[in-house]
Amino acid sequence: MNLRPEEISQIIKNEIERYEDKLEVVDVGTVIQVGDGVARVHGLENAMAGELLAFPNEVYGMVLNLEEDNVGCVLLGYDDDIVEGDIVRCTGRIVEVPVGEAMIGRVVNALGFPVDGKGPIVTDHRRPVEVKAAGVIERESVNQPIQTGYKAIDSMIPIGRGQRELIIGDRQTGKTALAIDTIINQKGEDVICIYVAIGQKDSTVAQIVGQLEENNAMDYTIIVSAGAAQLAPLQYIAPYSGVTMAEYFMNEQQKDVLIIYDDLSKHAVAYRAMSLILRRPPGREAYPGDVFYLHSRLLERAAKLKAGGSITALPIIETQAGDVSAYIPTNVISITDGQIFLEAELFRSGIRPAVNPGISVSRVGGSAQIKSMKKVAGPLRIEYAQYRELASFAQFGSDLDDETKAQLAKGERIVEILKQDQYDPMNVEDQVLILYAATNGFLLDIEVKDIREFEKGLIKFAQKKYPEIMTKVKGKDGLSDEVVAAFAECIEAYKKVFSKSV
């Protein structure tokens, strides 16, 4: 093909006009040290704290230390294929997780990837895991209850929507059981539940998933699992991923969310491991100086918003030999709005849930209690505390006056009434009825060993014979004269039925 000179010059002009400078400037560095899930990278002069770095073989890292001549970052994947001299690129973004309706009913890891074998999660929404908590102006005071289904807690240590209530106790005292029962009790309440397992055994998480599925609770629950075999950085990120998923429902859909962190002791240990490997200066119990901020910025994201929606946080802390004055327990106690203390001694003596109401407290939940529960809970707490004090003195002497004996008898029945089996949460109206019976002396002529049986029978009897009164208990009037009279009539009527069956 012959081309004329003017055609050639025209083609060259066209090519010059079409030419685009497609140079991409990327901040790159070199790995100078790697090991124990941590890498030091030289040359990333513009790296930002918390930024994602791209390593070879699709491994990502997160910047934690910004030093004079290098950057210290934790790896969100295994370091087996990363060697000194590898090229690392800045990404200009921070860790993000998928959020949205598609997450409900799924078990995901700390980065939001499914681990339940049910296929990929399809969602268009992603959110950064670290965001600023809602400000004071956006919040409103806690005024709605979140029912745990436990009589001892809903009456004496009530929890409100938007509250942060710590569950604290030694290992094997029923902390996780209390959290799981609270999730089961949210059925039909239009509450999204998120359970974050930090450093738990995979077998334990599988057991929890099975229990929630059995009770149809996975229909409104997301499980975020960073197991004991996972890397410390993933255990560190897991609670922030969980609360990010919760914030989507609170902010975008104005829904109420319940989030459980099980447990923050292991979260602090994971952060300590990362910090020590990064050579950050250790402080008390070898934790870094910012371990308080680690938990405060997480728990401050729980809120009740004026625009609607809330996040209620139930962090769990494991104590050693009941020592609540250790570093991490005192930190989290000072951040939260109260704590439920579960005592190993009570647990072993058969009082379950093993709540110690003496040092358990809810600072803001009282204003969220329903009217009828508030009325029965007042005398209950006082009488229970008096009974515990009297019982400790009564064991030293046998010559007790009649009034003391009556108080002890009433206290024994209150203790028995507050016992509850696992996976057996109770409706608030049923709780009010049985606590009313206990605090007003209706159970004094029932043997202590028969109390639990009497309780079950009374609830069934009331639901069958007095259904309209049971619905009024949750109303604005609370324990009106009409309800109180109906309660007394109902209890006396059932006592006659029960006495014939015993």
UniProtKB/Swiss-Prot annotation:
Q: What top-tier enzyme class does this entry carry? A: translocase
The protein's GO terms of the molecular function aspect are: ADP binding; ATP binding; proton-transporting ATP synthase activity, rotational mechanism; sodium-transporting ATPase activity, rotational mechanism
What CDD domains does this protein's entry cite?
ATP-synt_F1_alpha_C, ATP-synt_F1_alpha_N, F1-ATPase_alpha_CD
Swiss-Prot/TrEMBL site (Required for activity) positions:
S360
Q: Does the keyword Transport apply?
A: yes
Q: Tell me which Pfam families the record gives.
A: ATP-synt_ab (PF00006), ATP-synt_ab_C (PF00306), ATP-synt_ab_N (PF02874)
Name a single GO cellular component.
Answer: proton-transporting ATP synthase complex
Q: Does the keyword Ion transport apply?
A: yes
Q: Which superkingdom?
A: Bacteria
EC number(s) per entry: 7.2.2.1
Please name the InterPro entries in this protein's record: ATP_synth_asu-like_sf (IPR023366), ATP_synth_asu_C (IPR000793), ATP_synth_asu_C_sf (IPR038376), ATP_synth_F1_a_nt-bd_dom (IPR033732), ATP_synth_F1_asu (IPR005294), ATPase_a/bsu_AS (IPR020003), ATPase_F1/V1/A1_a/bsu_N (IPR004100), ATPase_F1/V1/A1_a/bsu_N_sf (IPR036121)
| Record membrane topology | Peripheral membrane protein
Regulation of activity is described as:
Inhibited by nitrate.
Swiss-Prot/TrEMBL keywords: ATP synthesis, ATP-binding, Cell membrane, CF(1), Ion transport, Membrane, Nucleotide-binding, Sodium, Sodium transport, Translocase, Transport
Main localization is membrane
Q: How does it assemble?
A: F-type ATPases have 2 components, CF(1) - the catalytic core - and CF(0) - the membrane proton channel. CF(1) has five subunits: alpha(3), beta(3), gamma(1), delta(1), epsilon(1). CF(0) has three main subunits: a, b and c.
UniProt family annotation: Belongs to the ATPase alpha/beta chains family.
Q: What does this protein do?
A: Produces ATP from ADP in the presence of a sodium ion gradient across the membrane. The alpha chain is a regulatory subunit.
Its recorded name reads ATP synthase subunit alpha, sodium ion specific
Chain's gene name: atpA
